[in-house]
Swiss-Prot record:
Homology family: Belongs to the glycosyl hydrolase 19 family. Chitinase class I subfamily.
GO terms, biological process: chitin catabolic process; defense response; polysaccharide catabolic process
Alphabetical keyword list: Carbohydrate metabolism, Chitin degradation, Glycosidase, Hydrolase, Hydroxylation, Plant defense, Polysaccharide degradation
Keyword Hydrolase annotated: yes
Catalytic activity: Random endo-hydrolysis of N-acetyl-beta-D-glucosaminide (1->4)-beta-linkages in chitin and chitodextrins
EC number annotated for this UniProt entry: 3.2.1.14
Gene Ontology molecular function: endochitinase activity
Enzyme class of the recorded protein, top EC level: hydrolase
Record-given protein name: Endochitinase 2
Function description: Defense against chitin-containing fungal pathogens.
Organism: Capsicum annuum var. annuum
Length: 13
């Protein structure tokens, strides 16, 4: 999804 975009400063991949 597009939640961690603002949740975490680092990219998931």
């Amino acid at each position: 999804s597009a939640i961690w975009f603002w949740m975490t400063p680092q990219s998931p991949k």
